[in-house]
Amino acid sequence: MIEDEIFHERIKFCIGLICGHLKSTQFAEMFAWQLGIEPKTIEKIDFRKKLPATSASAYGVEVTGKENNQLTTKTSSPVNEMFGTNWGLGFFKYKACDYCDDITAETADLTVGDAWLPQYVKDHRGTNVVVVRNEILAEILLKGVLEQSLHLDSITLQDVIQSQDANYRHRRAGLAYRLYLAEKKGDWHPPKRVRSSSSMLPWIQKRFVLRMELADKSHTFFQEALVSGSFSYFVEKMTPLIESYQNTYNQPL
């Protein structure tokens, strides 16, 4: 933006998202298929369909596509009742995401993300953590508060970290171990602020390895499921990996 005069002139602010990882289009197709919509006919999808009388994390997915050659729109039950929606499983994640260490879009003028904190998760509408790095935007937000068109609570740095604690573990300790594995195999990896390390319990190491395998296999097995025309095939292939991953959370501390 600084180097391109047109961008510098026209783009006044950059807004960033707190990101867990990026999904491929197969993530949307997986939702559609479970709702009875042909996966390659999706016309529109809302990944965060708010469901009243639920918590912020119990949102649904709304998909518009074809069922029996008829255009239809369907809304799911809370996503935690659907297969493959646990974000920690990393289904359909891009490999590049495993080497990203930027959680809060650090170069953005303003960053927003889910406020996964006990005091906010009961609101089904959801609540955002907002990190402001630009004085003009900070003044706009303050004006909104004074005019009562915006509600903001001041929270601590520790609260921000807690709201994304799993993300920080994956992008710090997890990244350190992924760098260690890459270096052990002699593979190139981008330079990172985190140093490679294997100093963690074996079952935590296994968890990080299984996350990589879950991401990798999800792409392959879903494509095979599309060819076979069977979503059950995808479930059958992924379930053993999911169970192995979940078992890493049953180890003694």
Model-inferred region functions:
Residues K40-L253:
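Long, compositionally biased charged/polar accessory segments in the mid-to-C-terminal portions
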Residues M1, L17-H21, R133:
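Short beta->alpha junction loops/turns
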Residues F13-H21, G84-G88:
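Flexible, glycine/proline-enriched loop segments at strand-loop-helix junctions
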